Regions:
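Low-complexity, acidic/Ser/Thr- and charged residue-rich accessory regions of DNA metabolism proteins
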Residues: 75, 115-159
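Short, contiguous, pocket-lining structural segments
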Residues: 1-4, 31-35
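A residue-level signal for conserved active-site and pocket-lining positions in enzyme catalytic cores
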Residues: 5, 94, 137
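Charged, solvent-exposed faces of alpha-helical coiled-coils
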Residues: 1-4, 8, 15
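Phosphate-backbone recognition surface of nucleic-acid-processing proteins
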Residues: 28-31, 37, 41-122, 126
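Extended, structured, electrostatic nucleic-acid-contact surfaces
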Residues: 10-34, 43-46
């Protein structure tokens, strides 16, 4: 890669790190395996005011754009693709966290989340499985930020 581009990336990463160095939300988010400083900063910047969701995860998921679109016809309800409403950067950050967790399979292989992902991948395909995992991670993040608690890997273990 071009040296100037690498230098520019490094400068931008340092600026981001300086901006969020005292941010409690970023530190909480970095306790999740697969979440780096850029992902944590992105998620924290878009979720500063969780009170606007009134403790309702469904509203939070709709804000991110990871809920299925709904098509009604008389008494039939069809669920379609995710809505993709909301900030694309935030949705991308959550998907990147999901992909990071999948990559960390040595550390996360016995987690229910990853087991559910693998099962859903064989049943429905990788795209749907990643979105399902993303939604579960978003729920974890929502609860963590609401309760001001770090990530607890003990809660993820299969029983």
């Amino acid at each position: 890669m071009n040296q100037k581009i690498l230098l520019l990336i490094k400068v931008v990463e340092e600026q981001i790190e300086e901006m969020v160095k005292d941010n409690e939300d970023v530190e909480l988010l970095k306790t999740i395996p697969g979440v780096g400083k850029i992902g944590a900063a992105t998620i924290a910047s878009y979720t500063e005011d969780l009170e606007r969701f009134d403790g309702d995860f469904k509203r939070f998921a709709a804000y991110i754009g990871i809920v299925p679109s709904v098509h009604n016809s008389n008494e039939t309800v069809h669920l379609g693709h995710i809505t993709k409403h909301g900030p694309q950067e935030l949705r991308t950050a959550f998907v990147q966290v999901a992909l990071g967790m999948i990559r960390l399979s040595k550390q996360t292989s016995n987690w229910r989340l990853i087991e559910d992902y693998r099962r859903k991948k064989t049943e429905k395909g990788s795209g749907r499985a990643i979105i399902a995992l993303t939604r579960k991670i978003a729920r974890i993040v929502f609860v963590m930020l609401e309760n001001r608690e770090p990530f607890n890997p003990e809660l993820m273990l299969s029983k």
